[in-house]
Each structure stands twice: as structure tokens, then as C-alpha cells.
Design a protein with these regions (language model features):
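Auxiliary Fe-S-binding modules of radical SAM enzymes
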Residues: 1-44, 225-331
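Conserved Radical SAM active-site core
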Residues: 22-171, 175-183, 192-196
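Alpha-helix N-cap and loop-to-helix initiation/capping positions
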Residues: 85-89, 124, 186-194, 222-226, ...
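Acidic-and-aromatic substrate-binding clefts and catalytic sites of carbohydrate-active enzymes
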Residues: 89, 151-153, 218-221, 250
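Short, electropositive alpha-helical surface patch
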Residues: 126-129, 160-172, 221-238, 263-266
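A structural motif
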Residues: 140-141, 207, 239
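Surface-exposed amphipathic alpha-helices with a cationic face
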Residues: 160-163, 199-205, 297, 301
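Conserved strand-turn element in the central/C-terminal portion of the radical SAM core barrel
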Residues: 177-179, 186-188, 201-223, 246-249
Length: 331
């Protein structure tokens, strides 16, 4: 038995009256061991698509095991009734999506990943995200997927087919160019270097991409070197645009406590600097926000990258007119 095989573990996920054993794979070579949830519960959801304005979205999972120290989805405002790492699985998501898409009068882009990453560890065996992509393809809709994980490459065949039949956009988050820092702030997902490799692979397949350069964590990754390195990587990978919300961080009840606990563990004394500067503010702009935003705008403009959230989201959500009309004999 190899060391990798020896490190593989099985964890028990509770489904109410049932218990399902799912194999969590070992860490990839050179990566830290994944610290995954020990519990996961399955639900029969009543609906799957949310949103308005012609851009519906879905979250197959609710909660996440990536462990990002800054995650806004931990906020009390989202009213989780279970621990964030006790991931809720909407086991009937593909069937609900099939019903919802067949009821629509016009095709559109379908988004996933805004609340919880669709490619966390359990997706390797549950394959619910893949099944939903199959439904999107079969019904002729477009798709946009937001993730931090290289597990998306498993579904490259579907992404390619969706992009050729309608439109597919992959949105990838790049927070810090420093892989060592990445393993602290985003501990249970592949490092930035690997995500950049994914962007290049997608470019080779002519699948368009957008990068989220957010959040910018005051006193951690808010440097010109970091922003420049990420933007240069975006240019080299041929991304269409970069999303930035002003070079800072937002904290609310729920995620603030988690973030500060992580600072205490990994960066002793830094929490005190945050409290002294920001108090309990919701928006925490970097002290260098103005300079970093100017740098961001300059590099994006020089390289033809979409740089405002409005421009990026507008382009992502746009499905060419020839794909939106549903014919009498469409499936």
C-alpha cells in the first residue's frame, strides 16, 4: 500500500436516517492534508434556481469545506441552521434543475458557486455538479461556474460542449500569488499556482475565464507586488476580465469572529491592528486601497481586460441572442 493510499480516509456523512461512507482522497503531492468536514447532511430541496433579471443561479451545496479564513458565506446574515462545515447537499438538485429549465420560455446563462464552491471535496464522488452541467447542456442553456478548485478539470468535456453549443464562463478566485500564504488563508483547496495552470488549460480549450481578485486582506496580501503578479498571470492566461471590489475586505457577524480567530492562530497581534483601525466596520479597505486600485485600473486598461464588476458581470451574463430563443421542437 502506497503512502498516498494509506492517507486516504473514509468519513461518515449523515443523511438523517441514513449514513453514507464517502472516501476523501489523499492530498495531492506537495499539498497539505485536507481537513474535511466529518459530517454532511442530505436534503430534498423544494427549488434550485434563485435570482432575477434573466440570470438565475444555483447552489447544489450549502456550506463548504475549503476553510477560507475570510469567507463571507459564514455570515450570520445567511441564517445557517447547521455548522458551516456540515455541508447541506441538495440531492435532488439535477431533477429540480431539469424541471426548472424545461419551464423557462427563454434560455439564459445559469450560474453556480456564488455561495458555496461546487467543486469541494465531496463532489468527486457525489458528482451533483457534473449532473447539473449535463442538464444545462441537454437543455441548451449557458453556464458560468465560480470556483477555487482544480477539480473543475474533471468536467472539462462538459464545459467544452456547453461553450460550443451556447456559452460557458469559468470564474476563478486568485487572492494571493504567494502559495505559502494561500495555504494559510485558503487551506483546503489547491494553491494559486495550480489555479493559474487551470486558467491556461481552459484557454487552450477556448473556454473563457474571469478572475476574482478579492478579497484583499489588509496587512497580508495588500501589496503592489501581489496585485501586479496576479494581474500579469491573468494577462498571460488570457482572461476576459478581473473582478475587484475596491481592494479590501468585508466582515460581518459570523465571519468576523472566524477571521479574527484565524489571525490569532497564524498572525499573532494582527487582530489588534484590525480592531484599532476598523473597529466593527463592515468594509475594511486596505490602507493602500487607492494606490492598489489605481495600479489595477492601469494594468487592466493597458491589456484590454474588463475591470469593473458591472462590465465583468454584464459580459458573463450575456448569452448571444441566437441561443436564447426556444423553438417548438426544442427538448
Amino acid at each position: 500500500m502506497t503512502n498516498d493510499t494509506a492517507r486516504a480516509v473514509r468519513v461518515r456523512y449523515h443523511t438523517g436516517t441514513d449514513a453514507v461512507m464517502i472516501r476523501i482522497p489523499p492530498a495531492r503531492r506537495g499539498e497539505p492534508e485536507m481537513r474535511c468536514a466529518e459530517r454532511m447532511h442530505f436534503v430534498d430541496a423544494k427549488g434550485i434556481l434563485t435570482g432575477s433579471g434573466g440570470f438565475p443561479g444555483m447552489n447544489v451545496y450549502r456550506g463548504c469545506t475549503h476553510g477560507c479564513i475570510y469567507c463571507d458565506s459564514r455570515s450570520a446574515g445567511y441564517r445557517f441552521t447547521h455548522a458551516f462545515e456540515d455541508v447541506e447537499v441538495k440531492r435532488n438538485a439535477p431533477e429540480l434543475l431539469e424541471q426548472a429549465l424545461k419551464a423557462k420560455r427563454r434560455r439564459s446563462m445559469i450560474g453556480t458557486g456564488s455561495m458555496s464552491d461546487p467543486y469541494m471535496h465531496c463532489e468527486e464522488e457525489l458528482r451533483l455538479t457534473r449532473r447539473c452541467l449535463e442538464v444545462i447542456l441537454q437543455n441548451g442553456f449557458g453556464a458560468t461556474v465560480q470556483t477555487k478548485s482544480d477539480r473543475i478539470l474533471r468536467d472539462l468535456d462538459l464545459l467544452d460542449e456547453i461553450n460550443r453549443s451556447a456559452k460557458c464562463v469559468v470564474q476563478m478566485t486568485l487572492t494571493t500569488y504567494d502559495d505559502a500564504l494561500c495555504r494559510i488563508v485558503e487551506p483546503n483547496v489547491c494553491p494559486t499556482g495550480r489555479r493559474i495552470e487551470v486558467l491556461h488549460i481552459l484557454r487552450e480549450r477556448q473556454i473563457p475565464t474571469v478572475v476574482w481578485l478579492t478579497p484583499v486582506l489588509p496587512f497580508l496580501n495588500d501589496t503592489e507586488e501581489n496585485v501586479t503578479a496576479i494581474l500579469n498571470a491573468c494577462v498571460e492566461a488570457g482572461v476576459r476580465g478581473v473582478v475587484s471590489f475596491g481592494m479590501g475586505l468585508t466582515l460581518r457577524e459570523g465571519d468576523r469572529e472566524y477571521y479574527y480567530a484565524a489571525l490569532d492562530r497564524h498572525f499573532p497581534g494582527l487582530k489588534a491592528r484590525y480592531i484599532a483601525r476598523y473597529g466593527n466596520a463592515y468594509m475594511l479597505p486596505s490602507p493602500k486601497a487607492r494606490e492598489l486600485q489605481a495600479l489595477f485600473q492601469t494594468v487592466c486598461a493597458a491589456n484590454g481586460l474588463l475591470s469593473s464588476p458591472e462590465a465583468c458581470f454584464g459580459w458573463i451574463r450575456e448569452l448571444p441572442e441566437k441561443y436564447t430563443q426556444l423553438g417548438l421542437f426544442d427538448p
